[in-house]
Amino acid sequence: HTHLREPGFSYKETIKTGSMAGAKAGYTDLCTMPNLNPAPDNAEHLKAQTDIIGRDAVIHVLPFGTITKERKGVGEIIDFESIADRVAGFSDDGTGVQNEELMKQAMTKCAKLGKIISAHCEVNDLLKGGYIHDGAYAKTHNHKGICSESEWAQIERDCRLAEETGCQYHVCHISTKESVDIIRKAKARGVRVTCETGPHYLTMCDEDLQEDGRFKMNPPLRAAQDKQALIEGVLDGTIDVIATDPVSYTHLTLPTKASV
């Protein structure tokens, strides 16, 4: 789960530099997310990425295709069959799939193709301009908060759809106690679901925030009880992977507190 930024954003990162960093760290394979320009939502756009991978990657780099056209999270699903043999799976990472019927269509297709759906879970209508967790720190310091439901509501929906369709489903960077509970229960029912969290969600919470923006991330650092639930999820096997989700920004493009 990496963001190698090419094509479209090579001033932030390239496939060459990202794969070199991976090799230096001991990785032999990287999966790169589709928040690119053009987004890999058809064979032509995917080829723009795989041509660079073939030329510049120093280790095995596996692209993800998008779920929706232009990675919008709304509108139409892509033609999965046209690129399924050249991608690790499908994701709109950076954007949540907002429509239940779209996600059901996508999961139905991917179940037939034997491909995984890897989801960034975020309900746009619940963000309300927030940029840190909607907890005590946000209220005390008069900041706009992001509620936990904006994450877990889509996970709850998707686990149900994965159960209905038989799709293999992976949840990116979970951060809330509710997410852990939903996934734990889904696994107990036999749903084909896996998930990851980041090391920062296991080691910090919104009590660690300061007024210098140094811990700006999405999902945000949640409450102490969320951190504890994530730790318990790692220990009992509910959480399958601790993933760093590396993503490069330039100083000028680093999101400010008012943007997500």
Task: List the predicted regions and their residue ranges.
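Histidine-centered divalent metal-coordination motifs
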Residues: 1-5, 120, 173, 251
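Active-site beta->alpha loop and helix N-cap motifs at the rims of alpha/beta catalytic domains
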Residues: 68-72
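A glycine-rich helix N-cap at a beta->alpha junction
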Residues: 54-66
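Conserved small/polar residues in nucleotide/adenosyl-binding loops
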Residues: 250-256
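Structural motif
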Residues: 7, 33, 64, 93, ...
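Metal-associated gating/positioning segment near the N- to mid-region
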Residues: 2-56
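Histidine/acidic residue-rich metal-binding segments in metalloenzymes
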Residues: 75-242, 247
